[in-house]
Every structure is written in structure tokens, then in C-alpha cells.
Amino acid sequence: MYNSTSFTIIKHYYILGIKMPKKCTQVFDEFLQVIHQNIVGEDKAIIDILNTLGVEQANDLISAAFLKHFKFMHLEHWQRYPLNIVSTDIIDEQGENVIHKCVRYDKIDFLKHIPSIGFNLGIPNKDGDTPLHLAYKKLIYAQSYPAFTKAKNTLLNIVNFKNKDEISSQFIGVLINLEYIFKPIIDFNYNVATFNHFMHHKPSAPILSDINTPINNFKPLLPRITLLRDINETSSFRDLAPPGHKRKTNSIEYNNTKKHKTISNDSHHNLYSSIENKRLDNDLNSTSKTTTTTSYNELDKLLIAFSNTNNASINNVLDTDEVALIGNKFI
């Protein structure tokens, strides 16, 4: 059945020179499943025809089918993939490639076979996140919002959080090792010393001296959301916040006349509200009452406090205008 159907498809689409789509759609789902079954089943006749027509053409279709069913695939499917013609550069409707899928679905064993087929860790998805971005986000989400990791209709529900802390750390380590060994030249944001300081993890060989790239040009890719300047620009963590989540807000009421303050909690403040950067009036002669509301949660407070530290070892490896906000708690 697969043979006859596949030959018919090849006759009508490949031999006639009609280019098939790279992405899986409902219209072509049946076609992609048939081709995929023949490839995984190592049907020699079909494989020979695909090789004759050109591996690059078949590559797009096979890789698209592979992405479509990646969540339910096992390592055996990956190992049985013939000719190593699957491409890690093919993306799905979300702009994610195979490496993104490995991070999302906790398939760390798949990453061990990535170097044999080639890869590019610098491909962003539609949200602008590389695989390393996703690994960091999983770790930050898991440590910042442990009670909401199973919330519906959020990114937390998309990412599998089984053994979240351990798996996220493993993914970051594996991805960084791949960066060191195979792709040292990527548009990074921070230098190696900064990354090693916060990761407390020394990548395996080769060491820095074995890399021909200058140390100043070799900077690991940290999430954009962890920059202090992002807090100043957006005044919120909207991209990290689960939709509809409520959090407590501390209302601090200062009375300059009596020189004391009263703190109350407001649990009806929405997480998406921006941080109100109002400054208190320091005029002691004023008898007016000044009230300010801050919406810092535990993560905000820790990151702000961390950015104000005077640790000499940190200042030596960080630029003054770009302070990394990933503390030990999140690593």
C-alpha cells in the first residue's frame, strides 16, 4: 500500500517538478505520513528514488513530517533515520526546529545524536527564542512560579516540567557544550566568564585556549528578559507572567509628618500591571501624605537586589550597563 501510494505521489509531484510545501498542513498530512513511513521503514526502492530526485528535495518533506510527530517519537525512530538526511534547519508553523522540540519535550537523549547530522543553535522561533533561550525560560519559570507550572493555556502548559530543575540544567549544559565544540561563533550577548560564573558549570573540552575565536567575541546567549535594562525599559515582566495570574502587591504608605510607614497587602493587583516607578517626595517640610505602590514580586526583588551588588568578581566580568540578573537561586 505504501509503495503504490508513494510511487504515485512521486510521479505527480516530484517528476512533474511541483515543489511540495516544507510545513505540515492538514491537506498534505496524509502524503507526509506515507513518505515518512517508507523512510522510517527503510524501503530501499523509495529511498533510491528519493536519492535520484535529490536528497535536498526529500529532506524538506521528511524533516517536516519528523517535526509534526516529534512529541510522540522515541529515540529508536531517530536512530533508524536512514542516510542522516533529516535537517535541523527545517522549522514548523511556530518557527521551531528539531532542537527547539528537544528542549520543549525534554528529549535530552536526542541531543546526543544532533552532531552527527549537523545543527544550528542560533535559529530563533517566532518569539525570538533560540533553544538556549527556551532552556533558560524553563528554569526561570520553574523556580519563579512553581505553583503555576501546570496552568492551562500558558507557555507553562506547553513546556513539560517533569523533573523541571534537573532537566533544565542538563539542557543548558548540553547546549553550551555543543556551542563550545561545534559552533563558537554566534551572536552572543555576554562573555564566557560571565556565563561560567552564573552557571557554576565548566563545559567539557575543548578549553578556551583551543578555540581560535578571540575571547571577547565569544559570548554565551542569555535570555533578553534577564537584562537590567529591560526592566528599565518595560518596567514589567510581562513576557514571563502567566496570563490572568494574580499576585500580591505591597502598598507602602509614607507619612512624612509622623515619620513612619504602614505596609498593607493588595492581592487584587494583576501581574501584568507595570511597575510604578514613582519616587517619594523627600521634602521633610511637606505635610502631605505620599503613597506609592510597587508590584515587585519575589523574583523582581531578588533581581533588583542582585543588580545592585558590589561583588568585585562580578563587576570584573560584567559590563556596567548590562548586568546579568540570573542569580544562584535560578541556577
UniProtKB/Swiss-Prot annotation:
Question: Mind listing the UniProt keywords for this protein, alphabetically?
Answer: ANK repeat
- Determine if Nucleotide-binding is one of this entry's keywords: no
Where the ANK repeats fall, as residue ranges, is: 94-159
Output the SUPFAM superfamilies linked to this UniProt entry. Answer: Ankyrin repeat
Name the UniProt record assigns to this protein: Putative ankyrin repeat protein RBE_0261
